[in-house]
Amino acid sequence: MAGVFSYESSEVDWCEDNYKHSENVVEYFNTMSSFIFFVISPIMLYLLHPYAKERNLAVHLVWIMMVFVGIFSMYFHMTLSFMGQMLDELSILWVLAIGYSLWFPRKHFPSFVKDRTSFARLVLTITIISTLSSFVKPTANAYALNCFAIHILYSLFVELKSCTDERVLRLAWASIGLWVLAISCWISDRFGCSFWQKLDFCYLHGIWHILIVMATAYASTLIAYLDASQEIPYSLPDLQYWPRNNWAIGLPYIVLKGTNTTRKTC
Ligand SMILES: CCCCCCCC/C=C\CCCCCCCC(=O)N[C@@H](CO)[C@H](O)/C=C/CCCCCCCCCCCCC
Ligand SMILES: [Ca+2]
Ligand SMILES: [Zn+2]
């Protein structure tokens, strides 16, 4: 049992050289880059609070769980232990489960599901089964998790096919662009390590951490905005960027322009 906590007990080892900067931290840059989770999560919790208050406070679970993903990611890269790998991957699975339960469009629910509560129960059941199955072939977990991004991309494509709103489309393209950059780094670190070692640049997995957190901030805000437009249209949701709306780079969030003024009564 103690073996699962041992350093390097995971079968996964990223391109970064082990113990290069510290004898206690296996992958130093990969560990430190996970700090981005602790920077972005509190900001997103703060920015999404008005939307969460109006829609459902459970929305906050997404970014609260992202803090745990950050903790487990740090622990995993610090030790490369089997326990670290499983905690890292299972926390991502549970963030996805929360996201699907909250935001998967009602109109695409399977016909036997009558409301969002039943849908959330179905997601919970599938997630518990997936959690148990993840121990069968742990090296396959990361690939399975990455497939969810493909499904999210497909769902966004279906939702935005007929959208002409410039701000929404801009956010969609930014989310997709960030994800493409992120997954290119992840794949390149996984499969192109000998090439990157020749260039003495083995930091792509750390860069992936930064890009995937940004992609999650962008894509989850877009999905939450589409959800708000359908579920709480009376609150007149709109998109803005923090810290300045007119800056090219910023964190997207939802403002509710109609709360308390135009709320429907029936
Ligand atoms: C209608 C559905 C709405 C769901 C929205 C919720 C989206 C957020 C989901 C997940 C958060 C991703 C957190 C990534 C943490 C990375 C930690 C890490 O690096 N782990 C690696 C090991 O250190 C491991 O190998 C990585 C495994 C793969 C993770 C795949 C995550 C899927 C990301 C989905 C992002 C959405 C982007 C959408 C693009 C338009
Ligand atoms: Ca390594
Ligand atoms: Zn990682």
Curated annotation (Swiss-Prot):
Its EC number is 3.5.1.-, 3.5.1.23. Pathway: Lipid metabolism; sphingolipid metabolism. InterPro entries: ACER. Keywords: Calcium, Endoplasmic reticulum, Hydrolase, Lipid metabolism, Membrane, Metal-binding, Sphingolipid metabolism, Transmembrane, Transmembrane helix, Zinc. The keyword Lipid metabolism applies. Residues 1-27, 78-83, 137-139, 189-205 are lumenal. Its main location: endoplasmic reticulum. GO terms for molecular function: metal ion binding; N-acylsphingosine amidohydrolase activity. It is found in: Endoplasmic reticulum membrane. Its cofactor is Zn(2+). One of its GO terms (cellular component) is endoplasmic reticulum. It catalyses: an N-acylsphing-4-enine + H2O = sphing-4-enine + a fatty acid; N-tetracosanoyl-sphing-4-enine + H2O = tetracosanoate + sphing-4-enine; an N-acylsphinganine + H2O = sphinganine + a fatty acid; N-(9Z-octadecenoyl)-sphing-4-enine + H2O = sphing-4-enine + (9Z)-octadecenoate. Endoplasmic reticulum ceramidase that catalyzes the hydrolysis of ceramides into sphingosine and free fatty acids at alkaline pH. Ceramides, sphingosine, and its phosphorylated form sphingosine-1-phosphate are bioactive lipids that mediate cellular signaling pathways regulating several biological processes including cell proliferation, apoptosis and differentiation. May also hydrolyze dihydroceramides to produce dihydrosphingosine. Belongs to the alkaline ceramidase family. This is Alkaline ceramidase 1. The lineage of its organism: Eukaryota, Metazoa, Chordata, Craniata, Vertebrata. The gene is acer1.
